[in-house]
Amino acid sequence: MSYHEIGQLTGADNETVERYIYLLEQGFVIFRLPSLSRNARNEIKRSRKIYFWDNGIRNALIGRFNPIALRDDTGALWENFLVTERMKINHYYLRYRNYMFWRTHSQQEIDFIEDYDGRLHAFEFKWNPKKKANLPSVFSEAYPGSEIRLISRENYQEFIM
């Protein structure tokens, strides 16, 4: 969601939305994840994803506390959980990484990327382990030597440890 879209929903101008996002970030309520772009024409360059450090705050703000099986935002909730827990455990163990996501103008996406040891380590998150993951070959072609892993309910524990 862009600042413009948030502004339209809330009735605030872009500058006010940016300032509020900044304040929420400074208060450790949310954080922004930048997009990866190394000059490929089809990559989105200045986009950011916004995550909540605590899914409970996210749920409170949108007023949804239904069981996971009854929710229509399971994918977003799962992604938010995995990204934040991975960043927390990396910080705890002093594993320094640069974090980002990747998206093209044609909406191909990698949910989460860590850049360390001179390589990109990409992760695609799926709540349903039986659902087919579309891992974009465009990413592998643009970033040879990168690793792409699918993270689901079956293997997430090793990801957040």
What residue spans do the PLM features occupy?
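Accessory nucleic acid-recognition modules appended to NTPase machines
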Residues: M1-R119
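Structural motif
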Residues: R119-H121, E147
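Catalytic cores of nucleic-acid endonucleases
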Residues: W127-M161
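Terminal-proximal interaction/regulatory segments of ATP-powered molecular machines
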Residues: H121-W127
